[in-house]
Amino acid sequence: MPRRGPALGDPTDFSYRINKITKIVDGDTIDVLLDMGFDIKYQSRVRLFGIDTPESRTRNKEEKVRGLISKEYLKQALKKAKKLTIKTHKGSETGKFGRILGEIFADGVNLNLKMCTEGYAVQYYGQNKSLVEAEHMKNKSKLIKKGVLKK
């Protein structure tokens, strides 16, 4: 039996073409129109899987600024892309609020990962809030150094 290598993908993953972004809710949530094939479209809210961005709708002004910066970064990345796809994983297709959980690919680049490496998001898999906040503070410093965020 042939071994499955990383280039062959996981048969439990599903990929869909994003026909249209209808709304960017915040840095880790978007509304999309998915192309399901056979001329079938599906409207849904998507939570970017495995990441967390600062809240853009909060009373904490400093966090809100960082949240809006993350939202704008995502908006620009999506806007520039010629081809957008979403990849979901069997067993974790939806989150606790019924949203699709997915990795967004813009022209083949995983935006979930890119947002983390660039300092606009942190990896999130349900860990302690204080650990997540500590990572957000590291990103804050990173964005200040880049000149994206003022002290």
Per-range role (PLM):
Residues 1-151:
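Small beta-barrel nucleic-acid-binding modules, primarily SNase/OB-fold domains
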